[in-house]
């Protein structure tokens, strides 16, 4: 009859007895269309009134629930195990979501919780003993890095995070906060690469906070990258001079160290930082560690620059990502930007002194908007412009734009027709920036072999890494050569180039070199040095002891 349902209605299941006895509406477990059923009374008669236009939820029979659930689980697991594509897609999804390869829960390694707690202790010690201050603003970056490391250790899903780099150099700190010097640009590029490869990077300021970090997680530390003077302090620290050394490092107090006062690993202090894990940042070509060039990190490939083919470990840097943000202009200012940070560069070691003005005046004017515009040379050397727009006067009629922020300088470079070197600064990143934005570089040749003047292997130039790069990208001019400089300026002013990034400045290559630094067995390499170079002399065994001592 209308408004009621019989027990034979296949679309109706009774509520459980406890529901009827409760005498109130209960939401059943199953979704069954757009009606639901309520008892008309609590008299025990199973007579239901259909209420329409309201969603109907129906509770299936209790005995069928466990069976249905079990069946569903079996079917799901059977399908997942038997279909590789399903497994692959699930793994891909997890990898995509997490950014790292997930490990199953049953693969949790014993001791991960203990290791995570040790990292927590380290974080607490650093925050208490070496907090982030105005003088050490990058230390607060460590807290997030350590939290990330703790999380992956606890869940046993670390990839490269468990491989730690300690950076004890003002250039890492300067690069992190936007420093524009050559060393800072290099360090920032290294830091970006280390992070992109998912290694853990920790900032330190001196040899004692570096030692504290190392001693808490020695097996995780793959490399300690030092500033030369800090490495020297670590080596020198002993029971008689430690107080004097600490006096020079106000932000790296070492009073926490009890017992023997030391920093570097030795037979008397085996818990110290190993030589073979210690690498030194060095902008120039000479090795600065007892283990030689492979433990001296350099921004340029000196094995290809030096006449004898000797070199340090080339890490290099890449400005590829950042310079690609800037436009390559078809129309440029009819001017050349002189590469010089300080006014003194125009008087000290200026290889074009006295001829810059003459060479400038020899460049033909450009026609812009129907008018002839003379070629000019400009510079950003010196102080910022005063309120009235004045700044230092520069020789030979060179226009001073005044010191400017990095972004503004880069735009000025991008709109120039050439970048002109006069001798200093050496190995600056600016020529690379210019080439990447389509601006050629005039590279001054400061020295050459008189009997073989065209042999570039024996040239000494302002930017030696570019001395093999040909025109129209790089114009090489001998110092004091007015004709050569005039001709180079004219060709550069009238020959447009597109973006040019040397192969060794590519990001992909730099990442591979950072991987090599992090993945090489440097203990084995150091043992070879001790055996071959030092002939296993006992006094050099501390460079790579027979017992590694880093676990």
Where are these predicted regions, by residue range?
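Short alpha-helical donor nucleotide-sugar binding micro-motif in glycosyltransferases
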Residues: 412-416
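Catalytic core of nucleotide-activated saccharide and alditol-phosphate transferases
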Residues: 219-350
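Catalytic binding pocket for nucleotide-activated donors in carbohydrate/polymer assembly enzymes
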Residues: 417-516, 531
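Short acidic, S/G/P-rich loop/turn micro-motifs used as interaction or catalytic elements
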Residues: 171-182, 209-210, 229-236, 240-241, ...
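Well-ordered, non-membrane alpha-helical segments in soluble/globular domains
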Residues: 180-190, 348-366, 483-490, 511-520
């Amino acid at each position: 009859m209308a408004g009621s349902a019989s027990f034979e209605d296949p679309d109706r299941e009774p509520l459980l007895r406890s529901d009827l006895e409760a005498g109130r509406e209960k939401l059943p477990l199953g979704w069954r269309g757009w009606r639901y059923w309520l008892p008309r009374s609590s008299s025990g008669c199973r007579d239901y009134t259909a209420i329409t236009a309201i969603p109907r939820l129906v509770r299936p029979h209790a005995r069928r629930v466990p069976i249905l659930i079990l069946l569903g689980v079996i079917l799901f697991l059977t399908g997942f195990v038997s279909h590789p594509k399903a497994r692959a897609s699930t793994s891909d999804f997890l990898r995509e979501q997490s950014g790292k390869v997930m490990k199953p829960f049953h693969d949790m390694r014993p001791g991960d919780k203990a290791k995570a707690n040790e990292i927590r202790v380290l974080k607490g010690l650093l925050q208490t003993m070496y907090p982030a201050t105005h003088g050490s603003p990058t230390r607060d970056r460590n807290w997030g890095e350590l939290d990330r490391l703790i999380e992956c250790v606890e869940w046993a899903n670390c990839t490269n995070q468990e491989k730690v780099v300690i950076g004890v150099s003002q250039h890492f700190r300067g690069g992190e906060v936007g420093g524009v010097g050559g060393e800072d640009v290099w360090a920032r590029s290294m830091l970006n690469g280390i992070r992109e490869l998912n290694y853990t990077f920790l900032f330190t300021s001196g040899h004692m906070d570096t030692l504290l970090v190392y001693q808490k997680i020695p097996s995780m530390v793959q490399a300690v990258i030092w500033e030369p003077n800090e490495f020297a302090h670590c080596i020198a620290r002993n029971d008689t001079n430690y107080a004097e050394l600490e006096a020079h490092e106000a932000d790296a107090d070492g009073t926490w160290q009890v017992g023997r006062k030391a920093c570097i690993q030795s037979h008397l202090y085996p818990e110290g930082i190993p030589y073979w894990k210690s690498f030194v940042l060095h902008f120039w070509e000479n090795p600065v560690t007892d283990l030689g060039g492979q433990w001296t990190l350099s921004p340029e490939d000196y094995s290809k620059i030096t006449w004898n083919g000797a070199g340090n470990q080339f890490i290099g840097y890449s400005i590829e990502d950042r310079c690609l943000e800037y436009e390559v202009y078809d129309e440029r200012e009819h001017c050349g930007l002189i590469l010089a940070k300080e006014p003194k560069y125009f008087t000290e070691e200026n290889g074009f002194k006295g001829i810059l003005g003459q060479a400038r005046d020899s460049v033909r004017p450009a026609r812009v908007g129907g008018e002839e515009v003379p070629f000019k040379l400009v510079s950003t050397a010196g102080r910022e412009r005063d309120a009235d727009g004045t700044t230092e006067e520069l020789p030979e009629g060179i226009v001073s734009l005044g010191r400017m922020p990095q972004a503004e300088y880069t735009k000025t470079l991008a709109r120039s027709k050439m970048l002109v070197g006069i001798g200093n600064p050496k190995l600056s990143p600016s020529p690379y920036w210019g080439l990447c934005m389509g601006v050629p570089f005039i590279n001054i040749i400061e020295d050459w072999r008189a009997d073989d003047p065209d042999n570039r292997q024996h040239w000494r130039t302002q930017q030696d890494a570019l001395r093999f790069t040909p025109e129209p990208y790089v114009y090489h001019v001998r110092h004091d050569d007015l004709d050569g400089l005039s001709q180079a300026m004219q060709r550069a002013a009238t020959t447009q180039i597109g973006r040019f990034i040397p192969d060794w400045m590519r990001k992909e290559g730099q990442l591979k070199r950072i991987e090599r630094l992090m993945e090489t067995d440097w203990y084995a390499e150091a043992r070879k040095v001790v055996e071959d170079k030092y002939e296993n002399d006992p006094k050099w065994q501390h460079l790579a002891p027979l017992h590694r001592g880093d676990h």
